[in-house]
Amino acid sequence: MIWHVQNENFILDSTRIFMKAFHLLLFDGSLIFPECILIFGLILLLMIDSTSDQKDIPWLYFISSTSLVMSITALLFRWREEPMISFSGNFQTNNFNEIFQFLILLCSTLCIPLSVEYIECTEMAITEFLLFILTATIGGMFLCGANDLITIFVAPECFSLCSYLLSGYTKKDVRSNEATMKYLLMGGASSSILVHGFSWLYGSSGGEIELQEIVNGLINTQMYNSPGISIALIFITVGIGFKLSPAPSHQWTPDVYEGSPTPVVAFLSVTSKVAASASATRIFDIPFYFSSNEWHLLLEILAILSMILGNLIAITQTSMKRMLAYSSIGQIGYVIIGIIVGDSNDGYASMITYMLFYISMNLGTFACIVLFGLRTGTENIRDYAGLYTKDPFLALSLALCLLSLGGLPPLAGFFGKLYLFWCGWQAGLYLLVLIGLLTSVVSIYYYLKIIKLLMTGRNQEITPHVRNYRRSPLRSNNSIELSMIVCVIASTIPGISMNPIIAIAQDTLF
């Protein structure tokens, strides 16, 4: 009799759990429809990989690209809808989160065609590569919409695990193995530091995990100005700093950039920064609302160190990928200016605008590096000497992307930096803006040094790599060239397109 009653209670409890899960999927699942499309794409890839004897490579790329494009379409159809919180407060959808999700999807969509020829030439496993790219994209999208501490911790771990696997994808390469080990160890340490900061925030707020409820909890417990909040702020800043890779949390960046496959570096260089920026703005702006002066000071120090160290050390680099690694450290210093400015003076809008341009500039540069590496087998800067004499189109494309990264007018990078620095100046961040302007001049110097190498025609400076350079047939490498052309066009957009882009960015503010 007792067993019968216990069995009935177990069935009732199981039914309640099932109905609750069904209710969440039915009513809240529509709010993560773009992510569900990518999950469905993952399942299709696994099914094709497990059922097909011979890998149908075009279909694998088609499914991956189509799922990303469909996810972007679903995201655009949801634009301007009312903000909603779903999954018991764990996930929030609003224009601010969705613009960052769009940027992550855009990065992934451009990175897949950029990787096609590289994967085929290096004989890397295709299915697993695409699975990791899509899974990392899903993790980044969930991080952008995360509304509680647990989701904010789990989502980047999903992204990070895929990043570790992608960075060590060429297992026979000693540099790749070394980079992966450093990346994994430092990533694990940063995650521990981040969750320790979350524990201080959780305890100080009286056991709350949702971002807005943490603010209410801090008010109720009168702990919003306590030393515990300062400790939480320091630990969380260090943890997020690893994802953004500003100085001094940048030690992993040059090694991972140099040792990882170039398409992987292109993917990580933009998606990790977009996702981490979205998370950082929400964490600093909501739970640490009462500590704005403290986190402003911390971020100002990080921005100054990043802009100075990143651009100065980039001058001394001989590897193209290491140079771009230090350049990205400097670039994130500019982005931090927008985070500090915040809502008050269009800081977030300027940050979003600049990140959109940064995606095109950076991916365009990496597309050129992938093409040059496949045709010559080298990544050293000096081996680019005289490339214009052999492949003017590739040399001009690389030059335009580098000049845009430097911020020379009338390229997109100039208008992005101008808007970002203007917002910083209006907010009173005079020191940061002046340092940003000076370090931008420094970056133009080392970019122009590379462009001078590209355009040189003196035989004594041309290395054997370029002297024996052979352009591939027109039909070959067309996917990489397609990504490169799209990114180059986006990097050279004149100022006439700035007004609609800024208007869209301003519309995302929460």
From Swiss-Prot:
One of the record's GO cellular component terms: chloroplast thylakoid membrane
Regions that span the bilayer: 24-44, 57-77, 99-119, 124-144, 149-169, 183-203, 227-247, 295-315, 323-343, 354-374, 395-415, 418-438, 484-504
Keywords, sorted A to Z: Chloroplast, Membrane, NAD, NADP, Plastid, Plastoquinone, Quinone, Thylakoid, Translocase, Transmembrane, Transmembrane helix, Transport
Membrane topology type: Multi-pass membrane protein
InterPro entries: NADH-Q_OxRdtase_suN/2, ND/Mrp_TM, Ndh2_N
E.C. numbers: 7.1.1.-
Cellular compartment(s): Plastid, Chloroplast thylakoid membrane
A Pfam entry, by short name: Proton_antipo_M
Catalytic activity: a plastoquinone + NADH + (n+1) H(+)(in) = a plastoquinol + NAD(+) + n H(+)(out); a plastoquinone + NADPH + (n+1) H(+)(in) = a plastoquinol + NADP(+) + n H(+)(out)
GO terms, molecular function: NADH dehydrogenase (ubiquinone) activity; quinone binding
BP GO annotations: ATP synthesis coupled electron transport; photosynthesis, light reaction
EC category name: translocase
Summary of the function given for this chain in its UniProt record: NDH shuttles electrons from NAD(P)H:plastoquinone, via FMN and iron-sulfur (Fe-S) centers, to quinones in the photosynthetic chain and possibly in a chloroplast respiratory chain. The immediate electron acceptor for the enzyme in this species is believed to be plastoquinone. Couples the redox reaction to proton translocation, and thus conserves the redox energy in a proton gradient.
Subunit organization: NDH is composed of at least 16 different subunits, 5 of which are encoded in the nucleus.
Family recorded in the similarity comment: Belongs to the complex I subunit 2 family.
Descriptive protein name: NAD(P)H-quinone oxidoreductase subunit 2 A, chloroplastic
